[in-house]
From Swiss-Prot:
UniProt name for this protein: Helicase SWR1
Gene3D superfamilies: P-loop containing nucleotide triphosphate hydrolases, SWI2/SNF2 ATPases, N-terminal domain, Tandem AAA-ATPase domain
Molecular function terms from GO: ATP binding; ATP hydrolysis activity; DNA binding; helicase activity; histone binding
EC number: 3.6.4.12
Organism: Cryptococcus neoformans var. neoformans serotype D (strain JEC21 / ATCC MYA-565)
HSA domain residues: 467-540
Length: 1920
């Protein structure tokens, strides 16, 4: 526990003498004033003086001892106990009253705040008296928690019982120990809490000098429990010490206590010194700490810390009992007012202050004893200078008169008594004595300004501190001081000499020792150096060995990489061969399908009418019963996969039974080879697990056993009633025969790929149950016309078979997951799914009872005539149904009665329809060599692109006997017959594939009749139904003939695929052929690219395809069409115009509109076709990914030519059964763009086995196979070698099944021709100068040499500007003359100007020419007789005061101006008024006389007479004054007199020709100098341009504009264009001009206006609604001669067939853009031949651009056009010749030598000329970089037009522009990979070394290489 705290606690219980001392001191006026001044300072609590020996120091006055004794006596008299008690009671009463007022005021404010916060004032109003009565618990709790003054102090912790108690306080009052620092900190905090004063934050010194006390209430300490002691010092307010034992513990007045002083900041040197900041070691802490307690309690008190002052250093004096007893009656320091612990424990202001001890108890300590060495004897002070004498004391050493004369201003009352003044003086003297005592001991150094800040915290002695307080006055040095200083210097020199000698000796000794040590350790050092050298050599050897081994590893690695490369090349070649074989097989299937369709239809039209006729609109579909799910709800993918795996096993069994039953049923084939030949044409359509399965395998028997059990189950269920029949009927309407293929996204760049995933679309029906249908029983489904026109709502479950364990391509996509989680739309979709599922389930429940009625309705429909059914379901009724080819209908009916009711599929299903899904662990072998067809073409079983036939019978389980195949002689077809026999032991699935032979035997007829008898009436109704269908088919067979025979025999025979009846309008022949090709893609499960040239109707063909699928296939969607934003509405209008039966959803708009359009998104019949844009499909990709699209169609598919774009990657992940790309330019820049399109169609890739080909080639393989060789061949321009021709042929073979491209010249015979010409134009003189000057610039040379791409493109753009027009590069300047104001006049001194101005104004003011009569000619407008008459009538003399009266004598003096009397003032006023009137009338009379006396010199009459002479000469346009005079006579010379305007007009040509060169400098304001004094602004006529005749010539000489004709003559292209436009206009042609730059359009506008041609303009700034108006106006108005447009905005989407001549002012890098511009005029609707002229500046960069464009055209010609990707190719080239020699590209031996100017014709549709020029191979992806660089360097207008065009054509293309990093990455990817080993230069050198040691067998290198090869697993991870 703290000793100081205990002593302070005990001080409150001292005798009353102590309290009296304190009270007297406090109440003394002077002392109280001093206390008030020092209340902001906190001094430590200390005892009072008890010894009178310690008085006031005598340094202030010689008589200080006498004054001190008198003051002490006065103080002693005032310290009586009675006076102290009276003053104390009075003070207590006052403080209690003040405290009560404070508490009442505080309580009132708190209550008002409570009412405001609780809004009580607003309800009841504020009443202070009523608020005082509010003592509710809520208020008391709120007041206690927030505004209780007692809570401001921290709680006092519990004091342990074991704490020691000091002699001055109880044991339980305070903690065990408190240091001075802690006590001081607590005193500071308590002082701020009890009496807060606005003080800046201060820092109190701590033990380490770095603790910051400041504003922190709880300082953190690191001592032994000091933190706890600090917290325990502050007592709890709840413990309040007001009522203590015996009432002795009282707390003094807070307001009278001295506040803690601000702690100084140690960082500020200029601040005051901290209290006790320099602790003095001479003060014994025993004296300072425990004197009071020892005196009171017998010297047994412990040391206590000081509260308000920091720690003092402990004195080194011994603390003995004797010392303690000796000073027991002494005190360390007097007590100063400060908050004590008693006050803290009892914060109540009602307590009495702690009394101060008396002087007797607390004497001053003696002065510290200092031992000083002094000079013995008296010291004589000698002054060597008068200034050294001390100054005389002020005021004569006596300040009594000054004190007596002191008067206090505040003392307004009577002067105090002498006793009161003496008491005050005693108190103040006491305080001053204490202060001086403390200063002498260094205790109050903080109150002293210290000049030297460096000694702020220094620990100096007491004498030094005292010396700083009482400074010795400065004096000058004398002789004695100099002598002492010299002695000090000599002494220092002697010491230095004494120190230097040992140092020198040590240096010498050290050198000798080093010498001997060097000799002694020489051998050891040499040994260590040798050892170090050996280690170094060993490390070098090891390093060289490692390097050698690393070299060996590199060589072996290079060999292995080379072997891997060779193996990869081999596998790649095999892969390419497999891909080519697959393409061949697919194309073979298409060709044979078309041929078979033609043959079949031809035979049908000429064969006997007794043949069974199948319907055109109903199809037979064989589906296992397990594929019909009883609950058709889209569930989890895992469940789908499990179900599908079961289907795979069952279908595998069925395929095995197909083969065996077919072998048994065939009469013409007896061995397996024959069967293999018969079925080899189905290898591309049937899975390889069926083709390659061994019939004798054990697995087959196991499956047969299971099939047998299934057959038994089927037999058992035969007698269950009509349930199987009902199931078949329901399946006929709800089933689907489509087998869908889902393509999952695949990494195109990866070298490995998964096997393609096929999905089987399973038919699901709510009415079919597993209990009533066997698991493996197949059923025949008939699809009625109702299914086509009114499709039923059904759920389709997709099961994906893939090698991947994840069937969903988006299931592992984190971005897709995040979007699904964050998307609110997905939650709505899920809710919609649940609602729709509930609706479907409810429909299924309600439909269970209506099943029988529906079946009866279907059977009733079978009895209706075919005409009624056709009308009911929307089919047109054909004419001529009764007979075909002249045969009666009865014969046909008779033949149908003889036909067997077999289950026949007349049209072979597509590849995936008949193919059974292969297991996930098997590899597709359908495209291997063993699966390829033989060269011999057997009778085909594939009918591709033909309409499906209607099944005429439905099989029922009532058939107990096996069905036999009967029929007439027709082409062989595949018939799938359901065979149910109980005793069949070969297989049990009942599926037999047999070949239908010639029909004519009686046995077959008999068997058929027997079968009909068993079937009963059901077959009768079906036969009647089929008769009507046969009639319809016979009527339609007239149009169904072979497509190839149409061109040779009849031109009006119907197509294979009929035009959908929902399609309005008639397709053109080539459009019908395109529809058939698209239908064949669907039938063969293929994707394709419709790449017809622009203007051939790709949109209508696509719409027709969707109509065909809906009408003929029953596939209504849903389809997704992605188009550019600008043509969304165009597609919608095309659908409404040609196919209004399809429900179309145009998905566009903002987010809210799209959300509204997604209402019913999952409802099947809400819409069938969704049309959206590329931008929206990316924004809502998470919505589109979730749907399984039937057909995904991409318009303008070249938008996905970049496989790195987000658009390509996003669309690749969509689920779609089929994909179709529409583009007019499938190949624009390079082959890799074509690869992007093809890979998008076939994203399968390569599997683990190179022979398992299920998809397309990856990026690297395609580049190595095709891109690199063909690019090299195109760029070199040499003749095609055999290898290149073979590569081209392979590429054609690869692309032919997937691309259909027709040119307008091929399909539109009536379309006029198109001819292209290149016009070479010479550069003008100015163009050549600018071109050469730009090329010779250093900056241009630097840009070309450094190779910076942007710099090169900027150079290219500037050169193109020069070639187009020099004004684009540098405008002709408008020349003006240099003109400025007079410089000398502007710089004249201001004072001269001021003087001139003042003088001018003075002259004008003083001199008035008119007033003095100097205006001689001013009155010439007046007539003479008027002036004379005016003088006659002058009446000036008649005015008042005109005649002055005669006066005699002197004039009377004027009266004086006297204001003292009224009479004199009135007299003066009368006189003044009279004088003023006289002067006024005199002025009026003089003015009147002057005005009446004015007269002209000649007069207007005389001048008019002289001006009207009849003989003067004037111009004819001047109006004469006397017209009657001129009518009499006109001078003969008058016509030669011209006016000034006429003269200026006649000289306009001369002025225009010669006033063209303005002078270099001209002078201004010549009129001012020529006519000084004439201000033009005062005469408006002078500023009128009509008045200024020389205005035109002056302006021509001031500014010179370029001549308008220079616009044409400065440019060679415009000169040529002027000539050609003149000729074309005379011949009646109309012109279309395209350019890339918007500024060129401005120049063309000026050019056309200058030459008088009418034109229209269209650029990027033209609004979309105005474009259609412009095009229609140009096409309809033949007066408009020219239409100018930018190629970027006018090249897409407009029709300009009114023009027959197209000019390309500049060429584009991409030739496909120019072709699009050409097609604006050369399209359907053009009636004249179209000529295209391309302007090229000779000997410029444009020639190289044209050459590069020709290379791209050549590449497109070789790859696309010569490939023959059209329908005619099938007729020209047989399918056997697909691998034959393909005619190569014609080699052009020579190139026409271009002259400087001329026109060269180019064969537009032929092969472009490959010029033999040396051109470096362009970087891959150059076109995109080029377009971006051109956009950066071209003009702002062109860039703006390009952006707007891009937004119209490709609205969202700019979002997928790749940055520089992506471009650099793309360049690295596109760089051709080296075919050699990737060995560095060092590896190459190693190869030479190996060859060098080849002649030495067994060399080290061979050994190392052999070792590395043998143990390659160990060396493979090693890297040098």
């Amino acid at each position: 526990m703290s000793n100081e705290s205990s002593q302070l606690a005990a001080s409150s219980r001292l005798p009353t003498t102590t309290n009296q001392v304190k009270t007297v001191i406090t109440d003394t006026p002077f002392v109280s004033t001093a206390l008030e001044e020092r209340r902001s300072r906190s001094l430590r609590a200390r005892p009072s003086l008890s010894s009178p020996s310690m008085g006031i120091p005598s340094t202030t006055h010689p008589n200080g001892h006498a004054t001190q004794s008198k003051g002490m006596e006065a103080i002693s008299q005032g310290l009586r106990q009675e006076a102290v008690i009276v003053r104390r009671e009075k003070r207590i009463t006052e403080k209690e009253r003040e405290l009560k007022e404070v508490v009442e005021s505080h309580d009132g404010l708190i209550r008002e705040k409570f009412h405001l916060e609780r809004f009580v004032t607003l309800l009841e109003g504020w009443n202070p008296e009523q608020a005082k009565l509010d003592n509710s618990p809520v208020f008391l709790q709120w007041k206690d928690s927030k505004h209780n003054l007692l809570n401001l102090l921290p709680d006092e912790p519990a004091i342990s019982a074991s704490s020691q108690a000091g002699p001055s306080r109880p044991r339980s009052s305070l903690p065990s120990r408190t240091t001075r620092r802690k006590a001081h900190e607590q005193s500071e905090l308590l002082a701020h809490v009890v009496a807060p004063v606005a003080k800046p934050p201060a820092f109190a010194p701590s033990t380490k000098g770095k603790e910051r006390v400041g504003d922190e209430l709880h300082a953190k300490t690191k001592g032994k429990g000091k933190g706890l002691a600090e917290q325990s010092l502050i007592p709890s307010p709840a413990e309040g010490a007001l009522h203590t034992k015996g009432g002795k513990r009282k707390v003094g007045d807070v307001t009278t206590d001295m506040l803690p002083p601000p702690v100084p900041d140690k960082r500020s040197r200029g601040s005051r010194r901290a209290t006790m900041g320099a602790p003095l070691p001479q003060i014994d802490q025993n004296e300072e700490v425990g004197l009071d307690s020892q005196a009171t309690h017998g010297g047994k008190a412990k040391r206590r810390g000081r509260i308000s002052l920091p720690d003092l250093p402990t004195s080194k004096k011994l603390r003995t009992a004797k010392r303690a007893s000796a000073v027991s009656s002494e005190s360390a320091s007097p007590v100063v007012e400060a908050p004590t612990l008693e006050r803290l424990a009892s914060p109540s202001p009602l307590s009495t202050p702690v009394p101060l001890p008396t002087f007797a108890h607390l004497p001053f300590p003696p002065a510290p004893h200092r031992i000083r060495k002094r000079i013995v004897g008296p010291r004589t002070i000698r002054y060597t200078d008068p200034s050294q004498r001390p100054p005389a004391p002020k005021y004569g050493g006596d300040i009594t008169p000054i004190i007596e004369s002191y008067v206090n201003i505040n003392d307004t009352g009577p002067p105090p008594e002498m006793k009161t003044l003496e008491a005050r003086a005693k108190k103040e003297g006491y305080l001053l004595a204490r202060v001086m005592y403390l200063k002498s001991h260094g205790r109050l150094q903080r109150l002293v300004d210290e000049e030297d800040g460096s000694n702020l915290f220094s620990t100096t002695t007491t004498s030094n501190s005292h010396a700083k307080i009482i400074r010795i006055p400065p004096r000058k040095t004398d002789y004695h001081d100099t002598l002492i200083a010299h002695m000090v210097q000599v002494r220092n020199a002697m010491l230095n000499v004494a120190k230097s000698k040992p140092v020198t000796c040590k240096k010498v000794a050290r050198m000798v020792q080093a010498y001997w040590e060097n000799i002694e350790g020489k051998e050891e050092r040499e040994r260590l150096a040798e050892e170090k050298e050996r280690r170094r050599m060993g490390k070098e050897i090891i390093k060289s060995l490692r390097k050698r081994w690393a070299l060996a590893v590199k060589v072996v690695r290079a060999k292995i990489l080379e072997a891997q490369k060779q193996e990869q090349d081999r596998l790649g070649k095999e892969h390419l061969q497999n891909i080519l074989q697959r393409s061949t097989g697919l194309l073979e299937a298409q060709i044979q399908g078309s041929n078979d369709s033609g043959e079949e239809e031809g035979e049908d039209s000429t064969s006997d009418n007794t043949d069974d006729s199948e319907g055109d609109d109903e199809t037979n579909t064989l589906l296992p019963l397990t594929s019909i799910s009883p609950e058709p709800v889209i569930g989890d993918d895992e469940e789908d996969v499990d179900v599908h795996d079961d289907d795979d096993e069952q279908q595998g069994e069925e395929d095995t039974s197909h083969k065996e039953d077919e072998s048994d049923a065939s009469d013409t084939e007896s061995d397996e080879n024959s069967m293999s030949e018969h079925n080899q044409d189905l290898r591309f359509l049937i899975s390889d697990d069926v083709l390659n399965e061994d019939p004798m395998s054990t697995g087959r028997f196991a499956e047969e056993d299971r099939g047998s059990s299934d057959t038994e189950q089927l037999t058992d269920n035969k007698n269950d009633g009509e349930e199987p029949k009902e199931t078949a009927v329901q399946a006929a309407f709800d089933g689907s025969d489509d087998v869908n293929r889902l393509e999952e996204p695949h990494n195109p760049v990866s070298s490995t790929a998964n096997i393609g995933n096929f999905a089987l679309l399973e038919s699901s029906s709510a009415e079919v149950s597993d209990a009533s249908c066997p698991a493996t029983m197949p059923i025949l489904v008939r699809q009625s016309p109702k299914t086509c026109s009114q499709p039923r709502t059904r759920k389709v479950k997709l099961s994906t078979l893939s090698l991947s364990s994840d069937p969903d391509p988006d299931i592992n996509d984190p971005e897709f997951k995040a979007r699904l989680e964050d998307s609110n739309q997905d939650d709505q979709d899920e809710e919609l799914d649940l609602e729709m599922e509930e609706a479907d389930s409810a429909g299924r429940e309600s439909g269970e009872g209506n099943r029988d009625s529906e079946d009866e309705g279907l059977l009733a429909d079978a009895d209706l005539p075919i005409e009624v059914l056709l009308r009911r379901y929307g089919y047109p009724v054909p004419e001529g149904e009764g007979a075909v080819n002249g045969e009666p209908e009865q014969s046909e009916s008779k033949g149908r009665e003889q036909a067997a009711p077999t289950s026949t599929v007349s049209e072979t299903l597509p590849s995936t329809k008949l193919s059974l899904a292969q297991p996930a662990n098997q590899t597709d072998q359908s495209l291997t060599d063993t699966a390829l067809p033989e060269p011999r073409v057997p009778e085909q079983l594939i009918i591709s692109g033909k309409r499906q036939r209607r099944k005429k019978e439905i099989w029922t389980p009532d058939d107990s006997e096996p069905q036999h195949l009967v029929g007439k002689k027709r082409i062989k077809k595949v018939e799938i017959v359901e065979k149910v026999e109980a005793d069949v032991h070969q297989n049990g699935d009942g599926l037999v594939i047999v070949e239908e032979e010639t029909m004519g035997d009686e046995d077959n007829d008999d068997s058929k009749v027997g079968q009909e008898e068993e079937d009963g009436h059901e077959y009768d109704s079906e036969e009647e139904y089929d008769e009507d269908e046969d009639e319809e088919e016979e009527g339609a067979k007239e149009d169904n003939v072979d497509w190839d025979d149409r061109q040779d025999k009849e031109g009006d025979i119907g197509p294979r695929v009929r035009q959908p009846f929902l399609l309005r309008g008639t397709l053109r022949p080539y459009q019908q052929a395109g529809l058939e090709w698209l239908a064949s893609l669907w039938s063969n499960n293929m994707n394709g690219i419709l790449a017809d040239e622009m203007g051939l109707g790709k949109t209508i063909q696509t719409i027709a395809l969707l109509g065909h699928l809906a009408c003929d296939k029953g596939v209504w969607g849903q389809h997704l069409i992605i188009v550019p934003t600008s043509v969304i509405l165009n597609w919608e209008m095309e659908f409404k115009k040609f196919l209004p039966g399809m429900k179309v959803l145009t998905y566009y708009g903002n987010q809210k509109e799209r959300k509204e359009k997604r209402v019913g998104w999952h409802t099947e019949n809400t819409w069938q076709v969704c049309i959206t844009s590329y931008q929206i499909v990316l924004a809502d990709q998470h919505i589109f990914r979730r749907k399984n699209w039937c057909y995904m169609i991409l318009d303008e598919a070249h938008n996905i030519k970049n496989f790195r774009s987000q658009r390509w990657q996003t669309l690749l992940g969509f689920k779609a059964q089929r994909r179709l790309l529409l583009t007019g330019t499938p190949l624009q820049n390079n082959l890799m763009e074509l690869w992007s399109l093809l890979y998008f169609l076939m994203p399968g890739g390569i599997g683990a086995d190179a022979t398992a080909v299920v998809g397309f080639a990856n990026h690297k393989e395609f580049m190595e196979w095709f891109s690199n060789p063909m690019d090299k061949a195109i760029e070199t321009g040499d003749a095609m070698d055999e290898e290149t021709l073979e590569t081209v042929a392979k590429l054609h073979t690869l692309l032919r099944p997937f691309i259909l491209r027709r040119l307008k010249s091929e399909v539109e015979t009536q379309l006029p021709g198109k001819f292209e010409h290149v016009v070479y134009c010479r550069l003008s003189k100015r163009q050549r100068f600018l071109y050469d000057e730009f090329m010779s610039r250093a900056s241009t040379h630097e840009a070309l040499t450094t190779g910076g791409y942007l710099g090169v493109m900027n150079t290219l753009m500037q050169l193109r500007k020069v070639c187009n027009h020099p004004d684009l590069f540098e405008m002709r300047p408008v020349k003006t003359s240099f003109a400025m104001d007079n410089v000398a006049r502007d710089f004249e001194p201001s004072d001269i100007l001021i003087r001139k101005r003042l003088l001018a104004e003075e002259d004008e003011r003083r001199i008035d020419a008119l007033a003095i009569g100097f205006g001689v000619a001013h009155n010439e407008a007046m007539s003479g007789w008027v002036a004379r008459a005016r003088q006659t009538y002058d009446a000036s003399d008649k005015l008042p005061y005109a005649a002055s009266p005669l006066r005699r004598g002197k004039l009377s003096a004027p009266p004086p101006k006297d204001t003292r009397s009224v009479e004199l003032w009135l007299k003066y006023r009368v006189w003044a008024e009279e004088e003023f009137s006289k002067r006024r009338w005199e002025s009026i009379r003089a003015t009147n006389r002057q005005r009446c006396g004015i007269s002209p010199i000649y007069g207007s009459t005389f001048l008019s007479l002289l001006g009207n002479l009849p003989n003067f000469l004037l111009p004819q346009d001047v109006q004469s004054r006397r017209e009657e005079t001129f009518a009499d006579f006109t001078p003969p010379a008058a016509k030669f007199i011209t006016s000034l305007p006429e003269r200026a007009k006649s000289l306009e040509d001369v002025i225009d020709r010669f006033a063209v060169i303005p002078p270099n400098a001209v002078a201004r304001n010549l009129a001012t100098y020529a006519l000084p004094g004439l201000e033009p602004i005062s005469h408006p006529a002078l500023t009128d341009p009509a008045f200024d005749t020389l205005h035109r010539s002056s302006v021509k000489l001031q500014i010179a504009f370029p001549d308008a004709s220079l616009l044409q003559y400065d440019c060679g292209k415009l000169q040529k264009l002027f000539e050609m436009l003149r000729d074309l206009k005379s011949e009646g042609h109309r012109v279309l001009i395209f350019t890339q730059m918007t500024r060129v359009l401005d120049i063309l506008e000026m050019f056309l206006s200058h030459n008088g041609h009418r034109y229209l303009r269209l650029d990027g700034s033209t609004k979309i609604e105005d474009r259609q108006v412009l095009t229609e106006r140009f096409n309809s108005d033949s007066r408009i001669f020219v239409f100018i447009a930018s190629s970027r905005s006018g090249g897409v989407g407009i029709n300009l067939t009114g023009a027959d001549t197209v000019f390309f002012y500049d060429s584009d890098w991409n030739p496909s853009m120019d072709r699009q511009c050409m097609d604006r005029a050369h399209r359907i609707g053009q009636t004249r031949e179209v000529h295209i002229y391309r302007f090229v500046s000779s000997h410029t960069v444009e020639e190289n651009m044209l050459r590069k464009a020709e290379q791209k055209r050549l590449l497109d010609k070789m790859v696309i056009q010569e490939g023959g990707f059209n329908n005619d190719w099938w007729g020209r080239v047989g399918w056997k010749d697909m691998f034959g020699d393909v005619p190569g590209i014609t080699d052009v031996s020579g190139v026409v030598e271009k002259s400087g100017e001329g026109i060269i014709d180019i064969q537009v549709e032929g092969t472009p000329v490959a010029e033999d020029v040396e051109v470096t191979r362009p970087r891959a992806g150059e076109e995109r970089e080029l377009a971006r660089a051109l956009a950066e360097v071209e003009d702002e207008e062109d860039a703006q037009a390009a952006r707007m065009a891009q937004g119209e054509g490709e609205l969202d293309l700019q979002e997928f522009e790749e940055g520089p990093k992506a471009v650099a990455k793309r360049v690295r990817v596109f760089e051709p990979e080296n075919s050699g080993t990737p060995v560095t230069t060092e590896a190459g050198e190693t190869g030479d070394v190996v060859e060098e040691y080849d002649d030495e067998p067994g060399s080290v290198e061979e050994y190392m290489l052999k070792w590395v090869e043998e143990d390659w697993d160990y060396f493979s991870p090693y890297r040098a």
